[in-house]
């Protein structure tokens, strides 16, 4: 989906503005940009290149984005039903993710949840784990510390998280909002807070 790729590319372009000077990303290294400042840091690499994702992950992201952009949460049902397993949407078992999202949403329609999905997917991502535990996770904040964010990373955090929650998260140093995980084989594993 060109829209999702453009959304991700646009978000990546915002990250490359540093100290008031525009710095164009190098396409050969953009996928390996990292928030880790020190060599040897175990912080996962932050990635922005949609095209660097495995094809099954891209397909799942496109399906999620298309359903979310519709504004109709029921359009997410075929995406959920086509998935190999029901993605985790809460720490406790949930039979019907759509009903759960409607119940948890501000207006009962789930549109704010769909918006959160799109916001999360517009940020950078990280690849975590290895083998059967490998996962692509959005936003990268879910897997990195928040205590040493650059100004551009703080702006990206504010785009994903309501400001009052972002401030509290920065104080604690831990991300505590929506995160989305897809395995390399395209199986959507979670979208939860």
Predicted regions and their residues:
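Short helix-adjacent coil turns
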Residues: 64-76
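Short, flexible active-site loop motifs that bind/organize anionic cofactors or intermediates
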Residues: 1-3, 47, 66
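Core hydrophobic alpha-helical transmembrane segments of single-pass membrane proteins
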Residues: 2-12
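C-terminal-biased regions
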Residues: 10-62, 77-193
């Amino acid at each position: 989906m060109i829209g999702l790729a453009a959304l991700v590319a646009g978000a990546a372009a915002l990250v490359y503005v540093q100290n008031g000077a525009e710095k164009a990303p190098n396409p050969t290294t953009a996928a390996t940009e990292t928030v880790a400042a020190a060599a040897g840091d175990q912080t996962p690499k932050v990635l922005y290149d949609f095209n660097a994702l495995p094809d099954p992950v891209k397909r799942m992201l496109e399906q999620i984005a298309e359903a979310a952009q519709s504004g109709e949460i029921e359009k997410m049902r075929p995406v959920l039903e086509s998935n190999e397993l029901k993605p985790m949407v809460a720490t406790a078992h949930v039979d019907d993710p759509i009903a759960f999202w409607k119940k948890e949403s501000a207006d009962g329609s789930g549109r704010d949840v769909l918006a959160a999905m799109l916001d999360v997917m517009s940020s950078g991502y990280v690849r975590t784990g290895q083998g059967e535990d490998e996962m692509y996770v959005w936003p990268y904040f879910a897997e990195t510390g928040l205590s040493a964010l650059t100004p551009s990373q703080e702006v990206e955090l504010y785009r994903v998280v309501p400001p009052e929650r972002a401030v509290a998260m920065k104080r604690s140093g831990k991300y505590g909002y929506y995160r989305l995980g897809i395995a390399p084989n395209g199986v959507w594993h979670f979208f939860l807070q």
